[in-house]
Amino acid sequence: MKFFQRPERRLKQWGLALLLAASALLPARADVVPLNHIVAVVNDEVITRQELAKRYDEVVRNLSRQNTPLPPRNVLEKQLLERMVTELALQQHARNTGVRADPTLVERALQRIAAQNKLDMAGLQAALEKEGQTLDGMRNTIRNELLIARARERDVDNRISVSDAEIDGYLQTQAQQGAETEYNFSHILVSVPENASPEQIRERRARAEDILAQLAAGADFAQLSASHSDAPDALKGGNFGWRASGKLPALFVEALKPMQPGEISPLLRSGNGFHILKLVDKRGLDATLSVTQTHARHILIKTNEITSEADARNRLLQLKERIDNGVKFDELARLHSEDASASKGGDLGWINPGDTVPDFEKAMNALQPGEVSAPVQSPFGWHLIQVLERRDQDVTQERQKLMARQAIRERKAEEAFQDWVRQIRDAAYVELRPID
């Protein structure tokens, strides 16, 4: 069983600057909503003028830190409201389909943020208050981000698979193109709704062409991204950072390949809408690759009509107690594991980054050698995981297939994610009201 073939997706690393900028999710919602301040209705919830104003102030602070010229207030507010609507629709989808944010994970995230910034919780609270925020507001932000991240893992990332035939095709294409290139570029997206009418497509194309004309006249790319782009990275100036060509859509690669740093692409059309790219820099990839490999073993209990989630978890808790009391892990794996590795005492051999499903890899990476995890849920059931050892390995010989698998997975996951967001947004009942 290839329970350890994972899509390329991780929860974002928490950082104080990111959360203070509120670049991901909505701030805490008030219990009492003044009706005359409603600026949007999303299904059975509302967004208020006060929430929009708070989000605006946070984003302005963030753009100012980045030295990004500010768009006109009315333009940025409209952009932010659209983003808040989409985020709320995603949160609702997650909650309505059974996703929950574990309070323990929320508190751990807060503690990590404080530790990363060399603060205790009181210091973190003081830092937030200087930015006009609260600890409870940050908790809500983290909770909402966890909801969306878990829903994405379940609905998108864990359903991505990469076949050997796809890897072979990728490597053949790379061989024909020569050495792979990395691109540092920025991006503006004018999205087109699914099943858009010809009139909607013409309107979106006109918007994109107007942006392109402004760029040709010398307008600031980051400012136009913040005010007009529908992409998730719009409020960061649209910058993608460094991406290997194999992890990008072919449409982008073909546009970027002949460009020189500082140049802007013509209008590009994809299933998601109209794209404009600006090349910041490009470079060849390093020919060598060293990765941290993990030697691990596990015990898997599958769930079915007879074995419930709770039953599987409780069985593993009992097995972990026996391991903690001195019973050998491999003996229990041979007796109880329902994975093909049971005959080998649950031994999975050496695992590379990107080999396992997100839930499994995240839990495995948190363990020290010799440590046994608490029960971990994955799409395949419930696991106990033990890390035996780790090593840094020069995998130059394996590099091509490893990079190919990760590149294909990341590209497919990103495309599927954009489709997923668009479908949820289009399916939501949305009523936009005047902001002022």
UniProtKB/Swiss-Prot annotation:
Q: What is its EC number?
A: 5.2.1.8
The protein's UniProt keywords, in alphabetical order, are:
Chaperone, Isomerase, Periplasm, Repeat, Rotamase, Signal
Catalysis performed (reactions) = [protein]-peptidylproline (omega=180) = [protein]-peptidylproline (omega=0)
Signal peptide span:
1-30
- Alphabetized SUPFAM superfamilies for the sequence: FKBP-like, Triger factor/SurA peptide-binding domain-like
Q: Which residues form the PpiC domain?
A: 180-281, 291-389
Using the UniProt record, name the top-level EC class of this enzyme in a single word: isomerase
Its annotated compartments are: Periplasm
Listed under GO biological process in this entry are:
Gram-negative-bacterium-type cell outer membrane assembly; protein folding; protein stabilization
Q: Name one GO cellular component term.
A: outer membrane-bounded periplasmic space
MF annotations from Gene Ontology: peptide binding; peptidyl-prolyl cis-trans isomerase activity; unfolded protein binding
Q: Which Pfam families match?
A: Rotamase, Rotamase_3, SurA_N
Q: Which InterPro entries match?
A: OMP_Chaperone_SurA (IPR050280), PPIase_dom_sf (IPR046357), PPIase_PpiC (IPR000297), PPIase_PpiC_CS (IPR023058), PPIase_SurA (IPR023034), SurA_N (IPR015391), Trigger_fact/SurA_dom_sf (IPR027304)
Q: Does the keyword Transport apply?
A: no
Task: Briefly state the protein's biological role.
Answer: Chaperone involved in the correct folding and assembly of outer membrane proteins. Recognizes specific patterns of aromatic residues and the orientation of their side chains, which are found more frequently in integral outer membrane proteins. May act in both early periplasmic and late outer membrane-associated steps of protein maturation.
This protein is called Chaperone SurA
Q: What is the lineage of its organism?
A: Bacteria, Pseudomonadati, Pseudomonadota, Betaproteobacteria, Nitrosomonadales
- What gene name is listed for this protein? surA
